Amino acid sequence: MACKNPKKFFPIRKSPVLRDGAFKGKLVLVTGGGTGIGKAIATTFAHLRATVVIAARRMEKLEQTARDITKITGGTCEPFQMDIKDPGMVSDAFDKIDMKFGKVPEILVNNAAGNFIMATELLSSNAYGTIIDIVLKGTFNVTTELGKRCIQNKTGASITSITAGYARAGAPFIVPSAVSKAGVETMTKSLATEWSKYGLRFNAVSPGPIPTKGAWGRLNSGEMGDIAEKMKFLNPEGRVGSPEEVANLVAFISSDHMSFLNGAIIDLDGGQQHFNHGSHMGDFLHSWDHKNWEDAENLIRGRTGKEKA
């Protein structure tokens, strides 16, 4: 049963938890930083006086987000184009970042992702591969590009990846994402044991239900407000989370206050993983027929503007 008075017992705090100037002099890279959770993470680091780089494929959105963050925080936020699926483009982006700032990032947040709901028997190999390429291979590309440069330069870094509870529990209808996120979590723990000798540490944050237009628009066929309202009753705390809560946790574990935290997977979900297998996918999806899936696919593609894979 969900809490009936979450505002009293589980209030949402959106202001930065660390002191002002906590990341002064630090260079932070956030992939997928143009929208949603990534934007909130970038904004929080900028509030805390880090020099922030946001990276994604679409420059137009990135440039607007960078302007917004700079205006809101008075800090520094720079956009860099990066298709994380392309190792060459990732390397080029790091070259440009190094050229502009004279160093590679001391903090990396792997937030770029892709996901959608689909009955697995209707899932094409191309669609499956697209998510693997973005989430698993893309995270590997960015992480190892930074890691190799840090090793060569003898500089340390904190790397945090955004994953999901269903990476461990599994989940229906989002198999490509579950497989990819599980790989990212295993990579996180593996590199924590291999690369700490070089001054690198690795952790992952696994958010629960966080309503964002990008992620939830690809996972649900209903309206955002309706979906969030339903999700409240599927969470022990009786509410959904906010991007700012994820951002505060990421900032905290990226700070020197948490330098002994390494190889950890931290769930931030109000207890969701123990309530609904961490997937946020209701049992109602099991009753859908092919017509329901076709209608949902067309609606979701209309939101993202993408052709069928």
Curated annotation (Swiss-Prot):
What SUPFAM superfamilies does its record include?
A: NAD(P)-binding Rossmann-fold domains
Q: Which residues constitute the catalytic centre? A: 166
Keyword Oxidoreductase attributed: yes
Gene3D superfamilies from the UniProt entry: NAD(P)-binding Rossmann-like Domain
Can you list the GO cellular component terms from the UniProt entry? Answer: mitochondrion
Sorted keywords for this record are: NADP, Oxidoreductase
- Could you give a single Gene Ontology term from the biological process aspect? fatty acid beta-oxidation
Tell me where on the tree of life, at the top rank, the source sits. Eukaryota
| Residues reported to bind NADP(+) | 28-60, 83, 181, 207-210
> At which positions is substrate bound?
57, 116, 124, 218
* Any matching Pfam family: adh_short_C2
Q: Carries keyword NADP? A: yes
- Enzyme Commission code(s) on record: 1.3.1.124
Quote the InterPro entries the UniProt record gives.
NAD(P)-bd_dom_sf (IPR036291), SDR_fam (IPR002347)
Q: Which GO terms describe its molecular function?
A: 2,4-dienoyl-CoA reductase (NADPH) activity
What this protein catalyses is: a (2E,4E)-dienoyl-CoA + NADPH + H(+) = a 4,5-saturated-(3E)-enoyl-CoA + NADP(+); a (2E,4Z)-dienoyl-CoA + NADPH + H(+) = a 4,5-saturated-(3E)-enoyl-CoA + NADP(+)
Q: Which family does it belong to?
A: Belongs to the short-chain dehydrogenases/reductases (SDR) family. 2,4-dienoyl-CoA reductase subfamily.
The job of this chain, per UniProt, is described as: Auxiliary enzyme of beta-oxidation. It participates in the metabolism of unsaturated fatty enoyl-CoA esters having double bonds in both even- and odd-numbered positions. Catalyzes the NADP-dependent reduction of 2,4-dienoyl-CoA to yield trans-3-enoyl-CoA.
Question: What protein am I looking at?
Answer: Probable 2,4-dienoyl-CoA reductase decr-1.2 [(3E)-enoyl-CoA-producing]
Query: What organism is listed for this UniProt entry?
Result: Caenorhabditis elegans
